Amino acid sequence: MSDLFKNQNKDEYPYFVTHLECSEKGNDYDANEVHNLSAAGKPLLVRYDLSALKSSITKEAVAERPADLWRYRELLPVRSTENIVSLGETVTPLVSIPSPDGKEILVKDEGRLPTGSFKARGLCMAVSKAKELGVKVMAMPTNGNAGAALAAYCSRAGIESYVFCPEDTPEVNMREIAVQGAHLWRVNGLIDDCGKIVGDGKKVTGWFDVSTLKEPYRIEGKKTM
């Protein structure tokens, strides 16, 4: 077992999510229910009781925790540790690279995440929250990296996944998604065509549409970057 899994923080922490909020209208939605977009067709944002949170934790306490994505638990939407779906999301470094003008350039090396890209952050969070809310099937359109992350985390969680890729998706990405256990289709069209299939399929099958900004939780994982 890797050190990432040995050192993963298994403690429970206070939960500060208060509600979901429509990004356009500002009206509230119950964070304990499954939601995609608001009634206005806009993204839902997770809201926290920041006043209570400030009195509960310190930067120093967070810094002493294991160096992984979940060290920021109080600012994340998963209530219970048992619902965390993890593949070992380590903290990633800023790497200095040469610059023609002599100025410092820092690159965030997200390739160290479990599925090789920053997409692992968002899908780690979305799948964990989906597990907590009792979601059984998830689906998305993708050009590659997000689909691989969804497939990997759904396999870890025991959630069925469906992934739709446009015709020009590289074969290496297709194989990565397939080997992670997703139901995979190459669509004769563009990413928008894949998105339409997922949206139409949601109406028929009831699967959870985890397309970008069509659910509240992927962005919650990405903010840890």
Language-model-derived ranges and their functions:
Residues 2-225:
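PLP-dependent amino-acid enzyme catalytic core
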